[in-house]
Each structure stands twice: as structure tokens, then as C-alpha cells.
């Protein structure tokens, strides 16, 4: 399978995935140019909307 790469940026946190995919963190699967991203090997596009009094619904 062909891997996908994703970066995550928070509104207040900035680049959350900074330094996530380095040779030190992933070993021999390291790919130059993807240092601030994470490798996505699977994805479930489900969206969960919390409901109930705690969430104002």
C-alpha cells in the first residue's frame, strides 16, 4: 500500500506534528521531506457528534 502523510496544525498550538517523522522516531521507515508529518496507514472517515446535557444538547 502507498502511505499517506498528514500534518496537524492547531489554532493555538501551531504545528502539532512538528518533528513527528524523524529518523530517531521511526527508524528505517524515515523518508526525507516528511519530518513534520505523520504517516497514515489507515483512516476511518467517521464523524462523531457528541450529544447530551454536558454538550448543551
Curated annotation (Swiss-Prot):
Task: Kindly list the places in or outside the cell where this protein is found, as annotated in its UniProt entry.
Answer: Secreted
Which positions make up the signal peptide? none
Cellular component GO terms, alphabetically? extracellular region
What positions belong to coiled-coil segments?
none
Sorted keywords for this record are: Secreted
Q: What family is this protein classified in? A: Belongs to the hcp1 family.
- Misc note: First appears in the mid-log phase. Present at highest concentration in the late-log early-stationary phase, before gradually diminishing. Significant amounts are still present after 30 hours.
Please give the subunit comment from the record: Homodimer.
- By what name is this protein known? Major exported protein
Amino acid at each position: 500500500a502507498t502511505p499517506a502523510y498528514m500534518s496537524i496544525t492547531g489554532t493555538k498550538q501551531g504545528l502539532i506534528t512538528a518533528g513527528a517523522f524523524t529518523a530517531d522516531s521511526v527508524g528505517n521507515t524515515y523518508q526525507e521531506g516528511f519530518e513534520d508529518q505523520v504517516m497514515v496507514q489507515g483512516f476511518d472517515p467517521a464523524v462523531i457528534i457528541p450529544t447530551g446535557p454536558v454538550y448543551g444538547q
